[in-house]
Amino acid sequence: MDELVVKDLIDRLIDLSFAEDIGDGDHTTLSCIPADAMGKSKLLIKEEGILAGIEVAKEVFRRFDPTMKVEVFIQDGTHVKPGDVAMVVEGKVQSLLQTERLMLNIMQRMSGIATMTNKYVKKLEGTKTRVLDTRKTTPGMRIMEKMAVKIGGGGNHRIGLFDMILLKDNHVDFAGGIHNAVSRAKEYCKAKVRT
């Protein structure tokens, strides 16, 4: 998938997440933290696994407050253990508090997927079998979940309905059998190539 399309999808998810979580403002933070208060926070690893989501987290911070400074110590795809510090973020305390939950939710989900994928990849080492993902993803999170699979050592099968024909039982049934489904798919592809 085109990098610009991926970036756009991630940006839209981040914006939607801000709207969902912050709305017209984090009233707790805005009410008790001075606007000019500066601080620093660190992402401390609590479980062993494969780290994923650092690049998305950096984008969360950048989109919310471009003045935030992020120092990354551990890259996506790295095996981590409790006590490791993945990154330190410095900036306005209001910005730190308003972005922390979104960053944590994204990184926990992506790291969980990358860790599980990596376990399967390791079990299959030495065979000719590859771990591939599916379209059975969380609505709105597909791109990030598929990124996590790749970070964990797996591969992406297809992103959506637009990038590959995959005849399944429902297609075969509604087309009136496998022969009809295959021949119609071939005709469709020929027509698509001509246009």
What are the language-model segments listed below?
Residues 2-195:
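Acidic/glycine-rich phosphate/pyrophosphate-binding loops and surrounding catalytic core
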